[in-house]
């Protein structure tokens, strides 16, 4: 049987398989990028490719369809102990049945290599700091490799191999064997189209065998993109450089509004709630805001922004998850929902899969389905027969920047100059010369401000003070220590009850997440896992010592004092109100131990979910799967609720300008794709942020428009003469709140006249709020159009927005309304009948652009719809469209 059986020709788009219909007519405006936007590593592709692609249908068919995998029949896979069955449904999702855990993961490795190997290979090159080996002499790739090598992700992953359990090692090894069985005797062009394209630019070697450490290194990338508050920590210090006033900086980082938006947990539900004294600290030292320190901080910021986004970070990265107990559901059993908000690309982040032991027993306990990462065995989010779990980003403060004084090869500790740790790394560049870099570290961690040379970054002011040495910025991060997160993933897969989840959570060290779970016997719960540093109060601190500002590396009082014990991390089972919502808001109110962070999402999204659930319960209606699906795609804007009353109070004399304002008068605050009011309001918000803050902040700290900025503006509305309303560039005029609001209304009317139409009735949110999925290597603007069109699905106009439950975020600082992050998948699990559960992912199962499963879920996802999620043996068999047998 051929290992390359061609797939059925896709419906809809002839290239991607995506349906041409979209929720909103998409017309993508020009893009402007900023530090937090998703970066793309782009390569130049020779004109030969364009000629070849249009030369004839035969070339296209042979070249692009060659890598499509076999989905039915029989394949011999070396290393298997017995036969393995792989059933695929209409979306191509594999459900794998095996006799042993090793065969199960061996088959998962084989199947994921069939579907997604180039994605796996790209990820391992990124996480190992070897991207230039894959794509060639590209400045972005070299910068990414330099920073990743500075972190030492691969080195930490190798150390992690020594601490994970023997069982985990066996599973990782089996997975690697399955991947390598697929790679054996296949040329690069038979594995993925991307290798053929890259081969026109650089020499493409046979892909290296997969190594178990490649899987562990992927966990470092996951932890990096979900690392917590490092952007806020840097932004505080950078904002001080222009504001020179800690009180004004504090205005930009208000306290979490617990009185408006409930934290995840009520302290009354905790067994032994403890109080913690927050150290607020007095005024900033003189060095903060100095040109020399600003230069070092900006260098660190640039370096960290060079790492390609693999999961998602910046505006919109977060998640929704909630669980409702059986007392409020139609089935009488808990129902759980989860939709992680991450960067969106093609292929998507998640790989759906089912992993089933033919006979579930202590020797083979896996019977689980859900969402995995291509490149790592097991299921990261999903359910087994007894328990479902979802993850959201906690945002705990697990990173600190330390401002170090460096002189020659030493750095200052107290009154002594101690040696820096130094190592040399060699970057291999396909088609180019090797590059050697020097990585220097303090006891806190690698010096990141030296990763990108100042000459390349065009820095005018060196980070230098000749008397005490030069400033440097080191990064301490929990994920740069080896841990057992890999053990936790398999423990989640096997967990049967709340105690099992608590034990698994103790192993899940990075990234710090919120776990909500539900059991088939009727319990619901929340567990906070993660390795969270303990920081001591520094009484005479010149900036807060709670981790919200960069810390003085020379003062040992700022050193971490260990970690919060896992048994002290917040946890609750069966809370009195009968549901739990975890959507990145504060875990506990301020002042309740343990201290996790002050930089939460501000809770507008979580509060809306609570309101919708409370309304159902108060009305006496039972919650079912459809209810949960409807909540997931709710598109009511909390921004509008806060701002529209003030906007309608402004008097606009010009009738033309007032036409936009009139749209807001009868608006229901919904952000549907066809809503003219939603489009106008977004333009007002963009202008309001620009008019209010751009004159006060450095470009790197300009407002993204996320939930923190809504909290900031909500507070500013109460003070019409706050200095932030004034434009510092108009020296002889002092602007106030109402002038800024009026100007934002007028400017938004003019903007949409240019961007859409003179007639407000022609405006539509979906025309400018566009999701344009890009391939990470071949999808960028420097790639020839025919190639981009082949690998990038059609743009889709989207509903929703930032801090909306249907969280299709956009970055106001970029000037564009394009979607920057969103629900990377949606799932709802009914513990009363697992076969009633639903799921969907943003693109599809396959990573092959020519596959009908490359983007066949996109239109369904964009419409806010889902697919049935079969789990029982009978339901999986009934849904099956293809059956593949893997034999020893």
Which residues does each predicted region cover?
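Hydrophobic alpha-helical segments
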Residues: 448, 510-616, 670-673, 684-693, ...
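Gly/Pro-rich active-site capping loops and adjacent beta-alpha segments
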Residues: 103-136, 390-438, 555-602, 616, ...
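Glycine- and hydrophobic-rich flexible loops that cap the catalytic core of alpha/beta enzyme folds
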Residues: 355-387, 391-553, 570-571
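Second-shell loop/turn segments in exported
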Residues: 104-108, 146-147, 154-170, 476, ...
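Substrate-recognition/specificity elements adjacent to catalytic centers across diverse enzyme folds
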Residues: 24, 51-52, 59-335, 340, ...
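Terminal end segments
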Residues: 595-657, 743-888
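N-terminal Sec-pathway targeting helices
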Residues: 32-53
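Terminal targeting segments of Actinobacterial cell-envelope proteins
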Residues: 1-39
């Amino acid at each position: 049987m051929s290992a390359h059986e061609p797939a059925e020709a896709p419906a809809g788009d002839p290239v991607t398989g995506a349906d041409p219909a979209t929720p909103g007519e998409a017309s993508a405006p020009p893009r402007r990028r900023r530090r937090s936007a998703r970066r793309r590593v782009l390569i130049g592709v020779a004109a030969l490719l364009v000629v070849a692609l249009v030369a004839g249908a035969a070339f296209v068919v042979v070249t692009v369809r060659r890598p499509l995998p076999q989905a039915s029949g029989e394949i011999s896979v070396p290393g298997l102990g017995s036969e393995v069955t792989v059933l695929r449904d209409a979306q191509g999702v594999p459900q794998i049945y095996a006799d042993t855990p090793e065969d199960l993961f061996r088959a998962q490795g084989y199947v994921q290599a069939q579907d997604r190997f180039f994605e796996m290979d790209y990820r391992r090159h990124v996480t190992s700091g070897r991207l230039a080996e894959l794509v060639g002499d590209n400045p972005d790739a070299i910068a990414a490799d330099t920073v990743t090598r500075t972190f030492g992700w691969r080195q930490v992953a190798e150390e992690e191999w020594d601490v994970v359990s023997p069982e985990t090692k066996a599973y990782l090894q089996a997975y690697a064997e399955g991947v390598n069985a697929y790679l054996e005797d296949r040329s690069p062009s038979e594995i993925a189209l991307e290798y053929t394209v890259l081969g026109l630019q650089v020499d493409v070697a046979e892909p290296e065998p997969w190594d178990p450490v490649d899987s562990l290194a992927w966990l470092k990338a996951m932890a990096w993109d979900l690392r917590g508050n490092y952007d806020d920590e840097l932004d505080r210090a950078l904002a001080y450089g222009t504001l020179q006033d800690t009180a004004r900086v504090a205005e930009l980082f208000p306290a979490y509004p617990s009185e408006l938006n409930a934290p995840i947990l009520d302290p009354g539900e905790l067994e032994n709630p403890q109080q913690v004294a927050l150290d607020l600290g007095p005024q900033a030292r003189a060095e903060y805001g100095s040109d020399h320190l600003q230069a070092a901080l900006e260098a660190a910021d640039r370096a960290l922004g060079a790492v390609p986004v693999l999961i998602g970070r910046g505006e919109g990265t977060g998640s929704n998850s909630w669980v409702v107990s059986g007392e409020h559901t139609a089935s009488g059993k808990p129902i759980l929902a989860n939709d992680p908000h991450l960067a969106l690309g093609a292929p998507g982040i998640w790989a759906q899969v089912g992993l089933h032991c033919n006979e579930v027993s202590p020797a083979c306990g896996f019977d689980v389905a859900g969402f995995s990462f291509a490149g790592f065995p097991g299921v990261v989010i999903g359910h087994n027969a007894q328990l479902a779990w979802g993850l959201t980003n906690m945002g705990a403060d697990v990173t600190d920047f330390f401002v170090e004084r460096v002189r020659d090869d030493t750095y200052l500790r107290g009154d002594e100059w101690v040696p820096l740790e130094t190592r040399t790394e060699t970057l291999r560049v396909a088609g180019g010369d090797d590059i050697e870099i020097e990585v220097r570290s303090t006891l806190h961690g690698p010096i990141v401000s030296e990763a990108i040379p100042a000459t390349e970054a065009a820095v005018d002011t060196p980070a230098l003070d000749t008397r005490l040495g030069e400033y440097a910025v080191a990064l301490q991060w929990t994920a740069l220590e080896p841990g057992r997160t890999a053990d936790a993933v398999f423990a989640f897969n096997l967990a049967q009850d709340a105690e099992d989840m608590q034990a698994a959570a103790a192993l899940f060290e990075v990234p710090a997440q919120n776990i909500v779970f539900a059991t088939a016997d009727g319990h619901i719960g929340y567990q906070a896992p993660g390795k969270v540093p303990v920081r001591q109060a520094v009484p005479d601190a010149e900036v807060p010592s709670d981790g919200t500002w960069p810390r003085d590396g020379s003062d040992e009082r700022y050193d971490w004092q260990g970690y919060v014990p896992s048994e002290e991390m917040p946890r609750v089972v069966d809370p009195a109100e009968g549901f739990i919502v975890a959507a990145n808001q504060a875990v506990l109110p301020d002042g309740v131990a343990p201290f996790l962070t002050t930089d939460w999402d501000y809770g507008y999204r979580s509060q809306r979910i609570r309101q919708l659930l409370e309304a159902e319960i108060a009305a006496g209606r039972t919650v079912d799967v459809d209810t949960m699906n409807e909540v997931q795609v709710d598109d009511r804007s909390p921004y509008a609720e806060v701002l529209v009353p003030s906007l309608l109070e402004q008097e606009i004399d010009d009738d033309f300008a007032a036409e936009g304002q009139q749209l807001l008068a009868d608006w229901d605050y919904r952000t549907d794709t066809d809503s003219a009011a939603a489009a106008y309001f977004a333009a007002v918000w963009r202008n309001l942020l620009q008019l209010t803050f751009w004159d006060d902040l450095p470009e790197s700290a300009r407002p993204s428009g996320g939930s923190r900025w809504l909290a900031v503006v909500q507070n500013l509305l109460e003070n019409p003469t706050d200095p932030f309303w004034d434009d510092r560039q108009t020296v002889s005029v002092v602007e106030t709140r109402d002038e800024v609001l009026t100007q934002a209304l007028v400017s938004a009317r003019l903007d949409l006249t240019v961007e859409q139409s003179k007639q407000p009735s022609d405006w539509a949110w979906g025309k400018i709020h566009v999701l344009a999925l890009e391939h990470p290597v071949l999808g960028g603007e420097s790639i020839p159009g025919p190639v981009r069109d082949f690998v990038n699905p059609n743009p889709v106009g989207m509903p929703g927005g930032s801090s909306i439950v249907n969280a299709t975020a956009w970055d106001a600082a970029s000037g564009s309304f394009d979607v920057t992050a969103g629900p990377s998948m949606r799932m709802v699990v009914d513990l009363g009948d697992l076969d009633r559960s639903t799921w969907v992912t943003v693109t599809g199962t396959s990573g092959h652009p020519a596959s009908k499963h490359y983007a066949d879920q996109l239109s369904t996802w964009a419409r806010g719809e889902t697919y049935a999620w079969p789990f029982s043996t009978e339901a999986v068999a009934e849904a099956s469209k293809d059956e593949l047998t893997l034999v020893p």
